[in-house]
From Swiss-Prot:
Family: Belongs to the bacterial ribosomal protein bS20 family.
InterPro entries: Ribosomal_bS20, Ribosomal_bS20_sf
Disulfide bridges in this chain: none
Gene (name only): rpsT
Phylogenetic placement of the source organism: Bacteria, Bacillati, Bacillota, Bacilli, Lactobacillales
GO cellular component term, pick one: cytosol
This protein's record includes keyword rRNA-binding: yes
The protein's name: Small ribosomal subunit protein bS20
GO biological process: translation
Membrane-spanning ranges: none
One example GO MF annotation: structural constituent of ribosome
Any Pfam family the entry gives: Ribosomal_S20p
Signal peptide bounds: none
UniProt keywords, alphabetically: Ribonucleoprotein, Ribosomal protein, RNA-binding, rRNA-binding
Length: 78
């Protein structure tokens, strides 16, 4: 455990940010799985939006976001 006051605060913030980021990534994964289970235009838009939000927040790399959206788009086109 940290001894310096600022380090203690940063450790607490790290825990909060980790929870927030984990929840955001989980929501993204859930949206993708929902689309894969039942491909539809509405679920595609929701999954695509969730991927874009995760990319904007820096949770996933822009290339991964692009790759994921391309794969979902290909499944929708089938």
């Amino acid at each position: 455990m940290a001894n310096i006051k600022s380090a203690i605060k940063r450790a607490e913030l790290n825990v909060k940010h980790n929870e927030k980021n984990s929840a955001q990534k989980s929501a993204m994964r859930t949206a993708i799985k929902a689309f894969e289970a039942n491909p539809s235009e509405e679920l595609f838009r929701a999954a695509s939006s969730a991927i874009d939000k995760a990319e904007t927040k820096g949770l996933i790399h822009k290339n991964k976001a692009s790759r994921d959206k391309a794969r979902l788009s290909a499944k929708l086109a089938k």
